[in-house]
Amino acid sequence: RNTPGPHGLTPYEILYGAPPPLVNFHDPDMSELTNSPSLQAHLQALQTVQREIWRPLAEAYRDRLDQPVIPHPFRTGDSVWVRRHQTKNSEPRWKGPYTVLLTTPTALKVDGIAAWIHAAHVKAATTPPAGTASGPTWKVQRSQNPLKIRLTRGAP
């Protein structure tokens, strides 16, 4: 991640206390810099800056420790629906159900899809209890025209 956080610092600046240097490390004259007094002064300044920056950052992240992250509830063998991000006309938003094969704290691997899927893009597939109808029943009747059928809906 290279986006500055709430303190306006990049990850490099958090670790090293300054923007990244533009130095050619393949230069043969680099060996002179390793023992130079300016490098020693820079390293001491770096240590001071790190002490100043790390305290406020530690306090900012300490607030998050009070609220532990709860991993997703999905386990191997569960049935899940996978979100379809680009739906076409009359296409359902969720596809599946798929069986969960592997899990990590943030992602799932499901049977039939090659890529890992983030847990936020998945929902549990609930099945109705055995012996109960999930919706209305439909009855098919022939009509006099061989190219047509009549569908009638019955009570659930």
Swiss-Prot record:
Task: Return the InterPro entries for the record.
Answer: MLVIN_C
Instruction: Add the further remark from the entry.
Output: This protein is translated as a gag-pol fusion protein by episodic readthrough of the gag protein termination codon.
Modification after translation: Specific enzymatic cleavages by the viral protease yield mature proteins. The protease is released by autocatalytic cleavage. The polyprotein is cleaved during and after budding, this process is termed maturation.
Gene Ontology MF: a single term: metal ion binding
For this entry, list what GO says about its biological process.
DNA integration; establishment of integrated proviral latency; symbiont entry into host cell; viral genome integration into host DNA
Q: What is its EC number?
A: 2.7.7.-, 3.1.-.-
Q: Encoded by which gene?
A: gag-pol
- Keyword Metal-binding present in the record's keywords: the answer is yes
Which taxonomic lineage does the organism of this UniProt entry have? Viruses, Riboviria, Pararnavirae, Artverviricota, Revtraviricetes
Keywords from UniProt, A to Z, are: DNA integration, Endonuclease, Hydrolase, Magnesium, Metal-binding, Nuclease, Nucleotidyltransferase, Transferase, Viral genome integration, Virus entry into host cell
Query: Required cofactors, per record?
Result: Mg(2+)
Quote the protein name from its UniProt record: Gag-Pol polyprotein
